[in-house]
Regions:
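Long, contiguous binding/interaction regions
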Residues: 1-86
Length: 86
């Protein structure tokens, strides 16, 4: 199986979606290298950056699923680091 390193950047404008996002990230926890959350109180938004090493399909599904939530914006940056695992 080929895995790829990527960073998923999430901007949350609707705080009601935070619990759903955390559930989705928990489901993908086997692939998460690390994450950082920053509350930006002056703008009333939250920023989350998630580093992953996963198959492209998993990254795409996670990013797409989170991006479907109302009040949430997602962008994913893929590295050229691809690893073949048995």
């Amino acid at each position: 199986m080929k895995t790829r390193v990527a960073v998923i950047s999430i901007i949350i404008r609707d705080k009601n979606e935070v619990e759903k996002i955390n559930e989705m990230l928990h489901e993908a926890s086997d692939y998460i290298i690390g994450r950082m959350g920053i509350p930006y109180r002056q703008k009333n938004i939250n920023l989350i950056s998630v580093a992953v090493d996963a198959p492209e399909g998993v990254i795409s599904a996670l990013s797409g699923g989170i991006g479907q939530l109302p009040g949430v914006t997602v962008k994913t940056a893929y590295s050229d680091v691809i690893t073949e695992t048995p």
